[in-house]
Amino acid sequence: MLFKVLSAAVYGIDANLIDVEVDYSGVVAEKDVFHTVGLPDAAVRESRDRVRAAIKNSGYLIPPTFITINLAPADLKKEGSGFDLPIAVGILGAYGALRVDDLSQFLVVGELGLDGSLRPIPGMLPVAILAREKNIPNLILPTANAAEAAVVEGVNVYPVSSLTDVLDLLNTSVVGVIQREPYRVNTQELLGELQHFSVDFCDVRGQQTAKRALEVAAAGSHNILMIGPPGSGKTMLAKRLPSILAPLTFEEALETTKIHSVAGVLDAAAGLVTQRPFRSPHHTISDAGLIGGGIVPRPGEVSLAHNGLLFLDELPEFPRNVLEVMRQPLEDHTVTIARASMSLSFPARFMLAAAMNPCPCGYFNDKSRECMCTPPMIQRYVAKISGPLLDRIDIHIEVPAVQYKELRGGAAAEGSAQIRDRVMSAREHQRKRFKKAGEKIYANAQMTTRQIRTHCELGADSERLLERAMQQQGLTARAHDRILKVARTIADLEGAEHLTVAHLAEAIQYRTLDRSYWA
């Protein structure tokens, strides 16, 4: 007897519909003979042992026979343990243990334990989105995956804890309608909750210039590099940067959750990523760990930071090849990983924050300690970061050591909430401007050269200032565009319609590594 069950496989951050066809011959054999066809990987081939034990330990005795399992379409490689449950349901359906013979209204996914219990699998959110796109109304999945799948509207999510629970659920259905309330979450309530951060900018004493630069970076989604001696507060500042970023929209939250779900790092209890990601990989990370890869391509740190912040501490300590692979994601906001069998793309629209010492000893240009490095040593150290990569960082800012009076005295520093209000006001200016122009971008950092010409017009005095800076500092055309983008953001923070000399001068000030004493 032939029985069909609908399931899904995840490739990249998207899911494909898979037909699980089970043929139960009924001819008694000495032992079960499983044949799985349709390009299964090792995990899928091993499912026969898990499925056989799960069926037996769930109380179903099926005589040994010849069973053929086809996973269609046959030209797609099937990977992972998510086919355990649909295969078991297909076998029991073919044997006659189900009172329904049409499961076309159900999508079934899950890994089985030997005792028949269900275990969660990564990538359930793309599966739920696939069910909605294919007009499959019901999704049966492990209980631990329910929260993330339920954020997709238009799909009835039914969490189950065991194979027996699945059969009870299906046997009580009437014409594809399950007699049980589906699992639901209120996405607006999740996103509407006040964000609580364990850190705040009011913790940071002094560093007003650096705080201002971080505010500008957050307002325009600009990449930023902080340069300063050990203990000056670079890492402390970077860890507080997420607290002034604008909240995620529902579309951004859904896209971010998809990536985290596929990578297997999603908090099962949360279901939806409601805060912008903050990723801070160690400098020993490989290029595959940073941008993604593997035999089965998985998202790397740049994709896990999508719609959020990627912080690289001690930037020159990262291997040169690791830093260079970031050039394409920083420019195109996507990562494409090519393999012999497939080519997958992962989104990587993130804000880069990096920190570094100014030299090997860490005290070049420091007022309180003498630098022990020679000029060639400093040049070699800074040269670890290539010019093309530096050009893609809009803001370079020096973070000097904090003086004792600033550390111990003075009024309380401004908190993250006040800074975030200004950032969100500037973002609203940008949103309205780009919407009015019919442009599908949301931040100044995303402007193309043509859009810069449209939105960053300069007066005569500003033109002369920019020309002088370009000549004196030997700036590239890309650095020219970065300065104008940052100047536009500074104007937005002030609510100004036109760029002034003051806006441009501040933006030029944020090109520390272009100055002569760094050359």
Q: Model regions: which residues?
A:
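Basic, amphipathic alpha-helical bundle interface domains used for macromolecular binding and assembly
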Residues: 40-48, 61-63, 70-80, 297, ...
